[in-house]
Amino acid sequence: MGQKTNPIGNRLGIIRTWESRWFAKKGYADQLIEDLKLRKMLKDKLYHAGISKIEIERVGEKVRVLIFAARPGIIIGKKGAEVERLKKEVEEKTGKQANIEIKEVRRPELDAQLVAENVALQIEKRVAYRRAMKRAVASSMRFGAKGIKVSCAGRLAGAEIARTEWYREGRVPLSTFRADIDYGFAEAKTTYGIIGVKVWIFKGEVQPGQYINYNY
């Protein structure tokens, strides 16, 4: 089971918490779709800032958006001008009072989503996929990861038949629920088609009853 499912979803309520935190008696589907659209809009607009994840909290007529980014300066802009612009866009989209907070990802080499996007970007720039994978693995292990697995799937190197190749170093215990495993997915759009990149990073074990608190 651990091999097939999303490691983040698999650990919800055990050592991880939800990225959308709100309750709704009615209009649940509308708010869920609004969250998805909001995440897509912010991700597309702030792609160059290296967005790791976006958390959304709703209380009454207020929306709180937490953006975890590798380069927060790009989002903030001069004297916070960009944040104000984003705030207005979020308020227009949701029709509620918005509060935007930016948090820095201090070690992007240990963030699975950012590592996956970096590998995908290298593949798009025609770097050999094996070299991109090995470089990402070496970098994460150097920064203190207990284990990492990187997988690339698609028409690798322009092959006629699509295949999957992966590279792993260290331990990645996907079936151990107390294991803090971060997961990220990105797509590389090449002339041959789309190549999917998946990354699993094992950072250690969490004691029962404790939740992961990343030092962002």
Swiss-Prot record:
Looking at the UniProt entry, the stretches that span the membrane are: none
Which key words are in the record?
Answer: Ribonucleoprotein, Ribosomal protein, RNA-binding, rRNA-binding
Please name the GO terms of the biological process aspect recorded for this protein, alphabetically: translation
- Annotated KH type-2 domain ranges read 38-106
Xref: CDD domains = KH-II_30S_S3 (cd02412)
Query: Pfam families in the record, alphabetically?
Result: KH_2, Ribosomal_S3_C
A GO cellular component annotated for this chain's UniProt record is:
cytosolic small ribosomal subunit
Domain of life of the organism in this record?
A: Bacteria
**Keyword presence, Signal:** no
Among InterPro entries, the record links this protein to:
KH_dom, KH_dom-like_a/b, KH_dom_type_2, KH_sf_prok-type, Ribosomal_S3_C_sf, Ribosomal_uS3_bac-typ, Ribosomal_uS3_C, Ribosomal_uS3_CS
| Subunit structure as annotated in this protein's UniProt entry | Part of the 30S ribosomal subunit. Forms a tight complex with proteins S10 and S14.
Return the protein name: Small ribosomal subunit protein uS3
Lineage runs: Bacteria, Pseudomonadati, Nitrospirota, Thermodesulfovibrionia, Thermodesulfovibrionales
